[in-house]
A protein has these predicted regions:
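Alpha-mannosidase-like glycoside hydrolase catalytic domains involved in N-glycan trimming
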Residues: 37-177
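Solvent-exposed N-terminal domain segments of exported/luminal and surface proteins
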Residues: 122-239
C-alpha cells in the first residue's frame, strides 16, 4: 500500500458514549445519554465524509471487522451507516470479496466513508461505553461557516453490537443501474453515458424517466507538418467495460475501462479507467484530461459539447445557471436565442414537476487563468442542457488535468442560493480533526 495516498476530501468518524457498563444489546436501538457536551451546528446535507485512514492514529487493530460508527442526536447514541474502502499502491479501489464485505486490514491510503448529515453532537469522554476498548472522535468542520458535527469510531474486541441497518445506495452491474431512495440512474450498456434519470416523490419528483440520453461531441483539429487531421468523436465512440463494482452502506462505486474507437482501420485506443461514486443524493465522476506535448503543439482547434437531452415529457421544465439567472423554459423557442452562452459558469439547475437537479462541472484553476471557459448549452427542441468548452487552444502546458462532474438531487424547487451547498462539496470540502479519546 502507498504511504503517499491522497488525503480525504472531507472527513469524520463516530464513537458512541454511554454512562456505566451497558450490555451490547442496548446498542441495537440507541441508548439515552446524559446531556451532550456540545451541540451539532453542521448543516451540510449532501456531502460525503471521506477520511483517509492514515490519520486514524493509534487504533488497537487495523482489522476493519471490529469497528462500529456512532453519533448522538437528542441525547441518544445510535449507529450510523459507514464503510471502509480499500485502495492499492496506485490509489485504485480494490474490488475483492473481503473488501466488499468491509473486512480487510487498513493501511495509510484506505478510506472511511460516511455522510456529513449523519454526524451529531459531541459527548463527554466519560460517557463512552465500557463494552468498547478504544474510541476515536472525529470533528467535522465546515471551513466557511466553522459549523461542526461529531462522529465516533469505536472498536470492540468481544461481541459486536449491531451496525446501522441503513443502506443508502446500490449499483447493479447487470442492469447498469444505480438506485437510492431519492433517485435512479441508468447507464447505457457498453458506453459511459446515461439513458435514464428518475427523481423520487420524496424529493418532489414523479419517478418518471426525464432523460433521453447524454450526448457528447468532441471535434479536435490537428496540424502536423503538411497534414491536417480533424476527427469527430461522439458518445458512441467511447466504449467501456465494467472493471469493478462495490456496494457499501454509504456509497456504491463503479469503475470502467475505457477505449476510443478510431475507425475500422485502427484498433481501439485504451483510455484508462473512470470511476463513478454514487451517494444517497448525488453522484460524481472525476476524470483526467491528458494533454501530451506533441498533441498540444499540433492542436489548432478544439470543440467540446456535452449535453443531457431530455424526453419530451420534460419540456415544461426550466433551466437556469450562474450567468442565466432568469428562468428559461424548454418549451419556449425564443429562450434558446436569449440564453447567454459565452461566459464561464460552473453549475446549472433543471427543475419542474419531475423534480429538480443540479449539475456542476469543475475544471482546473489554470484553465480559467488561461481564458478557457465553460459555456452554456441550452436547446429548446429537443430539450437539452449542458456545457461547452471554449478557447481550448489556450492550453499552454502539457500535463494531466483533473476535472469533476457532479449531479445533485435538490430537496426542493430551486431557490436563489441553493447551489451554494452543493458546490461546497467540491469548492470547500469539509475538514476533520481526529482524536483518540479512549
Amino acid at each position: 500500500m502507498n504511504k503517499h495516498g491522497q488525503l480525504s476530501l472531507s472527513a469524520g468518524v463516530q464513537a458512541f458514549g454511554i454512562c456505566g457498563c451497558v450490555c451490547v444489546a442496548l446498542f441495537s436501538g440507541g441508548v439515552n445519554l446524559a446531556s451532550a457536551q456540545e451541540a451539532k451546528t453542521l448543516t451540510r446535507f449532501h456531502d460525503p465524509v471521506v477520511v483517509n485512514t492514515g490519520i486514524l492514529m493509534g487504533l488497537p487493530t487495523r482489522n476493519t471487522a471490529g469497528y462500529r460508527l456512532y453519533s448522538v442526536h437528542q441525547d441518544v447514541l445510535s449507529p450510523i451507516p459507514f464503510q471502509f474502502d480499500e485502495r492499492d499502491d496506485m490509489g485504485e479501489i480494490v474490488f475483492s470479496e473481503t473488501a466488499a464485505k468491509n473486512e480487510f486490514r487498513l493501511d495509510e491510503n484506505d478510506e472511511l466513508v460516511f455522510m456529513a448529515k449523519d454526524t451529531g453532537d459531541r459527548i463527554a469522554t466519560e460517557l463512552l461505553p465500557a463494552t468498547s476498548d478504544a474510541a476515536v472522535e472525529i470533528e467535522v468542520t465546515d471551513p466557511v461557516t466553522r459549523a461542526r458535527g461529531w462522529a465516533y469510531l469505536l472498536h470492540f474486541s468481544g461481541s459486536m453490537p449491531p451496525s446501522s441497518p441503513v443502506t443508502y445506495v446500490r449499483f447493479d452491474a447487470e442492469t447498469n443501474q444505480a438506485r437510492t431512495s431519492l433517485y435512479t440512474v441508468d447507464n447505457y450498456p457498453g458506453r459511459n453515458f446515461f439513458t435514464g434519470l428518475r427523481i423520487a416523490p420524496a424529493l418532489g419528483g414523479t419517478d418518471e424517466n426525464i432523460l433521453e440520453r447524454m450526448k457528447l461531441r468532441v471535434h479536435p483539429t490537428f496540424s502536423l507538418f503538411l497534414s491536417t487531421w480533424s476527427p469527430l468523436f461522439t458518445e458512441e465512440d467511447f466504449s467501456v467495460r465494467i472493471d469493478g463494482a462495490k456496494n457499501g452502506p454509504v456509497r456504491a462505486i463503479r469503475r470502467v475501462r475505457q477505449s476510443l474507437n478510431l475507425g475500422q482501420y485502427f484498433p481501439d485506443m485504451p483510455g484508462g479507467t473512470a470511476y463513478t461514486y454514487y451517494y444517497f443524493s448525488s453522484f460524481m465522476t472525476p476524470s483526467t484530461f491528458s494533454a501530451p506535448w506533441l498533441v498540444l503543439k499540433a492542436l489548432r482547434d478544439f470543440e467540446f459539447v456535452g449535453v443531457s437531452e431530455f424526453r419530451s415529457s420534460a419540456s415544461e421544465m426550466t433551466y437556469r445557471d450562474a450567468v442565466n439567472p432568469q428562468e428559461l423554459t424548454f418549451s419556449a423557442q425564443k429562450n434558446g436565442a436569449e440564453a447567454i452562452t459565452g461566459k464561464d459558469h460552473d453549475w446549472y439547475v433543471v427543475g419542474g414537476k419531475h423534480g429538480t437537479h443540479l449539475q456542476a462541472f469543475m475544471i482546473p484553476e489554470q484553465w480559467k487563468e488561461w481564458g478557457i471557459l465553460r459555456g452554456t448549452v441550452f436547446r429548446p427542441e429537443p430539450p437539452a442542457a449542458g456545457y461547452s468548452l471554449l478557447n481550448m487552444t489556450n492550453l499552454r502546458e502539457p500535463g494531466n488535468y483533473k476535472m469533476n462532474m457532479i449531479f445533485v438531487i435538490l430537496t426542493r424547487p430551486y431557490h436563489t442560493g441553493d447551489e451554494v451547498q452543493s458546490l461546497a462539496m467540491l469548492k470547500d470540502p469539509l475538514r476533520a480533526t481526529v482524536d483518540r479519546i479512549k
